Regions:
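Asparagine-rich low-complexity intrinsically disordered tracts
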Residues: 1-19, 67, 335
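Generic hydrophobic alpha-helical membrane-span motif
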Residues: 34-36, 84, 118, 126, ...
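Short, glycine-/Ser/Thr-/acidic-enriched flexible segments
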Residues: 66, 79, 174-178, 199-201, ...
Length: 358
């Protein structure tokens, strides 16, 4: 009996020394659970009445709003790219979650859809509780702004398989549109292009910016006007959900382009139609955030074409509307303090469709 106990004791000592647990492998389940406890009340504040279950289940349930007779679901997914690196350098992660939501829901609303719910994916080498809380808090804030329920997500630790202290984000949004309201793009001669002011660079062009900071040894603390460059770069992406929703009720928005990767030109090309040209006014390009764009253009030695295909050039969303609806649209946008410019016109063409700068 005593011998057996001794053997077991020795085995326990040996096993404790050589024990391989999830935690020693780099995954801290207890820390993950603490993060979930923090997320639950944040998510609950974003819940619409259509949410049918709580955070923490294996899946999330959402009832399609009753007002839709023939609902069509609309989905989008995106990330925030290397803007995360700027957040890392400045150790400020409070708004990067807003960027994540914005990148997804702004894509969603270009089809005329109403955002319904959102899920996120956060992957990191090891959970940093404060950093993760800041990120998720930003996501919840973005969901509140867009009236979109944060109904689930995933936080993954990839020990020794992901750079130390680094993370990445992905978001997934789902919305709905009435089937009869799905439009095919159809333009008329002299329709106008309305550029809605961006809050800054939004979430694109940051790989170029990081390279620029490195090569030219530009400090994020350096001033651009009255603000530091770092603060300007981290300004969260503008969410246009409320403005677009109200505009759609009052005027006919013929098409929309969310100005993201590919810059102003690259995204406008996605809504060009056969037999119509887009004629952009040169003096309206870089109308907003002039000092920032002038700095980037000079320091990186970029041509106008490269700037237009890399950055949003001051416009986060471009709409095509009839000219006779401009006054009505202006009243709505003023109500939401949304600045804008008429940046061009649509002209009928017999040649191949193109974007011209005049």
């Amino acid at each position: 009996m005593n011998y057996n106990i001794l053997i077991i004791s020795k085995l326990n000592i040996l096993s404790s020394k050589n024990k391989i647990s999830y935690k020693t492998s780099g995954v801290d389940i207890a820390l993950g659970e603490k993060l979930v406890d923090h997320i639950k009340p944040l998510a609950k504040k974003t819940f619409r009445k259509e949410v049918l279950n709580e955070i923490g289940g294996f899946s999330s349930l959402f009832d399609i709003p009753k007002k839709y007779k023939k609902p069509v679901l609309v989905s989008s997914t995106d990330g925030v790219g290397t803007k995360i690196e700027i957040a890392e350098i400045l150790d400020n992660h409070k708004t990067i979650g807003i960027d994540l939501v914005a990148m997804c829901v702004n894509d969603l609303i270009t089809s005329g859809a109403e955002p319904l719910f959102f899920l996120d994916y956060l992957v990191t080498e090891k959970i940093n509780l404060k950093k993760s809380k800041d990120i998720i808090s930003g996501i919840a804030k973005g969901c509140k702004i867009s009236n979109c329920s944060l109904i689930g997500g995933e936080t993954a630790e990839h020990p020794r398989n992901f750079p130390k202290n680094k993370y990445d984000l992905a978001g997934f949004s789902v919305g709905v549109i009435e089937k009869e309201k799905i439009k095919k793009i159809k333009y008329d001669n002299n329709d106008i292009l309305i550029g809605l002011k961006s809050s800054g660079l939004h979430s694109n062009g940051f790989s170029l910016i990081r390279e620029l900071l490195k090569r030219k040894k530009i400090k994020l603390s350096s001033k651009v006007g009255s603000k530091s460059l770092g603060k300007i770069l981290l300004e969260p992406t503008k969410i246009y959900v409320k403005e677009i929703k109200q505009l759609s009720k009052s005027i006919d928005i013929k098409s929309m382009a969310h100005i993201t990767g590919g810059g102003l030109l690259g995204n406008l090309e996605r809504i060009v139609c056969d037999n119509y040209n887009f004629e952009l006014e040169r003096n309206k390009l870089f109308f907003y955030h002039k000092k920032l764009f002038k700095l980037l253009m000079a320091k990186a030695s970029l041509s106008n074409e490269e700037m237009l295909r890399t950055f949003n050039c001051g416009y986060g969303m471009v709409l095509v509307i009839r000219e006779n609806e401009l006054k009505k649209g202006t009243r709505i946008l003023k109500k939401y303090n949304q600045s804008f410019q008429v940046i061009g016109r649509i002209k009928k063409s017999k040649d191949k469709s193109q974007i011209k700068i005049i």
